[in-house]
């Protein structure tokens, strides 16, 4: 374990993860001394660790991100097992994004949204403005060609955005954030997957009781049985966890 400013780092499978105690700790860390940190936020769960193990390009993308945090309960439990004194809790990416947007609205921080279907993105913008008065300085749905990427990066740079959130799924969103940072480096980037869909009610999230019990994965599996193949991959992660191969 090493210290990273006001938050410790815990290594799993060679990747250093930030150990936030709770959401308040996460926000205070990202807005330390009234200055929003710059870099890339990546949510880490068991599935992402497995993918990083098998795909060198994904591992390089994740390793390059400054702020890797424990999004999955299995990752939190592994940290606690490997580091018994760790005071770390799960900070779900969807919850962190909402908290970040609420804080951005309060601070007047300019935000640029990328990804999602056009109608979902429009609803996300409207709800963010209504709910937290978020200063959205630009947006782009997820339907653009590779040839349009540089124009998008130029728009983001011209907007002066300090927070850029990208909902395209992994590893597409990590690739886009990496490339955009070459044009617009002075911002906090966050990959958010399907968060816009959840935020606007198009996708139902597990009830709070399931989340609090660490069973959100089971709720998703019961709601979407086709996920069983993906979930079977996690048996490998369980072996890592219980044999201490972390």
UniProtKB/Swiss-Prot annotation:
InterPro entries: UDP-ManNAcA_Trfase_WecG (IPR023085), WecG_TagA_CpsF (IPR004629). NCBIfam families: PRK03692.1, wecG_tagA_cpsF. Pathway: Bacterial outer membrane biogenesis; enterobacterial common antigen biosynthesis. It catalyses: UDP-N-acetyl-alpha-D-mannosaminouronate + N-acetyl-alpha-D-glucosaminyl-di-trans,octa-cis-undecaprenyl diphosphate = beta-D-ManNAcA-(1->4)-alpha-D-GlcNAc-di-trans,octa-cis-undecaprenyl diphosphate + UDP + H(+). The gene is wecG. Its EC number is 2.4.1.180. GO terms for molecular function: lipopolysaccharide N-acetylmannosaminouronosyltransferase activity. It is an enzyme of class 2 (transferase). HAMAP family: WecG_RffM (MF_01001). It comes from the Bacteria. It holds the Pfam family Glyco_tran_WecG. This is UDP-N-acetyl-D-mannosaminuronic acid transferase. GO terms for biological process: enterobacterial common antigen biosynthetic process. Belongs to the glycosyltransferase 26 family. The keyword Glycosyltransferase applies. Keywords: Glycosyltransferase, Transferase. Catalyzes the synthesis of Und-PP-GlcNAc-ManNAcA (Lipid II), the second lipid-linked intermediate involved in enterobacterial common antigen (ECA) synthesis. Signal peptide: none annotated.
